[in-house]
Amino acid sequence: MKGTVYLICDSANNLYKIGVTKGDINKRIKKLQTGNATELFLANHHISEYPYRIETMLHNHFSTKNVLNEWFDLSHEDVVNFRNICKIMEERIKCLENNPFFMKKIH
């Protein structure tokens, strides 16, 4: 089932949230904005058949830059390359999806 892996920026703190939505990305941003005193905006995104797996892989990939939960202190280069990183991860998943040792449920 398709979903969107997103990178949302907290403009005041220059932190980025890596998350997933299966719905409308703009509605997700509005929901996150509620109760948040600083402006949030979409910095980058990737639509995928494997959004939850890619989100997990991204959290692992950027683990040294993790600040709190799903919020990360990413560089400009990380933000610019986000979609390419997601595409590489998606290709890895596709190569391994028939391997029974990789995962039981791919989505």
Identify the meaning behind each predicted range.
Residues 1-107:
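Non-catalytic accessory segments flanking enzymatic or RNA/DNA-binding domains
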